[in-house]
Curated annotation (Swiss-Prot):
Gene: mdh
GO molecular function: L-malate dehydrogenase (NAD+) activity
Catalyses which reaction(s): (S)-malate + NAD(+) = oxaloacetate + NADH + H(+)
UniProt source species: Colwellia psychrerythraea (strain 34H / ATCC BAA-681) (Vibrio psychroerythus)
Biological process terms in GO annotation: malate metabolic process; tricarboxylic acid cycle
Subunit structure: Homodimer.
Gene3D superfamilies: Lactate dehydrogenase/glycoside hydrolase, family 4, C-terminal, NAD(P)-binding Rossmann-like Domain
Name of the protein this chain belongs to: Malate dehydrogenase
Amino acid sequence: MKVAVLGAAGGIGQALSLLLKTQLPAGSELSLYDVAPVVPGVAVDLSHIPTDVKVAGFGRDDLNGALTGADIVLIPAGMPRKPGMDRADLFNVNAGIIKVLAEGIVASCPKALVGVITNPVNGTVPIVAEVFKKAGTYDAARLFGVTTLDVIRSEAFVAELKGLDVATVKVPVIGGHSGTTILPLLSQVEGATFSDEEVAALTPRIQNAGTEVVEAKAGGGSATLSMGAAAARFCMSLVKGLQGEDVVDYAYVEGNGADAQFFAQPVRLGVNGVSEILPYGELSAFEQKAKEDMLATLKKDIQEGVDFMAS
């Protein structure tokens, strides 16, 4: 099993790489790529951790070396959010970065499972899809926007609010990966009920949790550690799927288009990526209205990615 992390020297990339070094199956390879000159040092640092996962670092000019033979590619590369910015402000900077990296994947490992972490995910995932389409190698089952951070935040906040064991809390989160497009389905949380007031307070807290971190770090970073943990968790779901285990997780994928071309929803994972897109169940009246209200924003975000490639 070879996993490549593109943008491995950044805050998310280093946290993610550390977790993968300790969690990937024995005998795996972890390939770290970044344009920052520190990346070989990150690889050396991680290589001192005694697990049976081989680590190699690749600099700016060796994207092909990092990607060749990769089964899974995770992309946290790009500029992080700063105070006063929302995810959409990042689009103009990160769209170009994602395009270049996607072209590298097409050239070096077109059959890999690709997990896009670079924000704004609503728009960067369509860019990757368009790059693959242009090359004639697009397979929707192999492309994922990683929205796991919304899920783990929801789990943490619900457990805290209700005094539950967080290990038992499961919160479905559908839609997109920014602002109101993030839709936690609190009505479906087993073992907990929420008042209308709690739903009205908790939903925006989950949606704006990224801003909470950016402001708390006072210009010193964004949600790097929790995002690293979320990406590692999603990567391990992909690994289990590749190993033939029956795994269901949430991700932003191209489905049947019932809601939007790309939509975060439950998916069954297998040896070829998505083996089945699952229904997300019945919504409460609050959730139904929230979904209807955000679809125009989500579709606009998706179109922005498509238009970027068309230009």
